[in-house]
């Protein structure tokens, strides 16, 4: 299994996205969605990171998290899975710059 590195950018984005839905959906749903994101990273992407095709414009992989409105943006090698961003599935991806990631 690969080690997993989560960027500070990912963490901030996830917290912001979850906070946007808290009033509408409640704490329980928000906690479930957060758990789904982390379970997907730990139980699937860490083992099968190549299960999604690389976006040619970004040079990174995109993975929609089932049961959530979120898409993970990541790269990997044999030793490590690196989660760069998390976005809403309808977000404009053309403005993403991998150089903006804070680790």
What feature does the model see in each segment?
Residues 1-36:
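Arg/Lys-rich, positively charged N-terminal/basic patches that mediate binding to nucleic acids
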Residues 39-67:
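A short, surface-exposed loop/turn module that caps and links secondary-structure elements
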Residues 67-103:
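Enriched for short, Lys/Arg-rich terminal
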Residues 5, 13-16, 57, 61, ...:
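Acidic/proline-rich low-complexity IDRs
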Residues 12-17, 42-43, 50, 70, ...:
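Conserved N-terminal glycine/acidic-rich loop preference
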Residues 23, 27, 47-54, 92:
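Charged, solvent-exposed alpha-helical segments that act as regulatory interaction surfaces
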């Amino acid at each position: 299994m690969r080690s997993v590195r989560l960027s500070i950018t990912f963490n901030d984005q996830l917290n912001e996205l979850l906070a946007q839905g808290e009033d509408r959906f409640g704490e329980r749903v928000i906690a479930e969605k957060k758990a789904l994101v982390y379970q997907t990273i730990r139980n699937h992407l860490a083992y099968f990171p190549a299960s999604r095709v690389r976006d040619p414009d970004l040079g990174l992989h995109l993975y929609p998290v089932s049961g959530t409105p979120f898409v993970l943006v990541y790269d990997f090698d044999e030793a490590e899975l690196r989660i760069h961003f998390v976005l809403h599935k309808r977000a404009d991806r053309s403005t993403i710059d991998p150089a903006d990631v804070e680790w």
